[in-house]
Amino acid sequence: MKKVAIFASGTGSNFEKIADDERLKDKISIELLVCDKKNAAVIKKAHDRNIKVFIFSAKDFESKEAYESVIFEKVKDLDYIFLAGYMRIISPYFLEKYKKTILNLHPSLLPKFKGKDAIEQAFNAGEKEIGISIHYVNEELDGGEVIAQRSFEVAGNDTIETVTEKVHKLEHKLYPEVILKLVEEALLKEH
């Protein structure tokens, strides 16, 4: 059993899919949700599942390093961190301290459309194929090694709303699958 933290900032739909995935139940224990928005819907989803929550507001700290130091103390003994709609950039300071695996889910086919509003950027650019990437987190924004990608062809009648919905469906399916594979491989190596 691997102990993990999930970092999220919004509704928590990916958090929910990971937490409720039956294949992961005996492989991971979600020890903590880290959230930077006190009114985020993901908080209730964590509470409903009896998962501890750490909520912080960046403005309550003198620096990014200050709040990341507090977060590090809470996650330092955990095996993995999974970013699921976490809207803050993990700093080199944190990456230097936390030497274990951090995964991120990004709603574009990296290396295209890094950063915020990736779905909208891809749609407005007239991309014929849109998708998602799951990658290791490193010091470069959305620049770590890509582990998995999935995509779909944009239909002529697609809108930004329908494309966003299709992206979320891909996320909800692929992220738990990638986590399962990663954890199963790690557990096999231990035996």
Could you tell me what each predicted segment is?
Residues 26-70:
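Short, surface-exposed acidic-centric catalytic microdomains
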Residues 13, 40-41, 62, 88-89, ...:
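Short alpha-helical
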Residues 1-41, 45:
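N-terminal Rossmann-like dinucleotide-binding module
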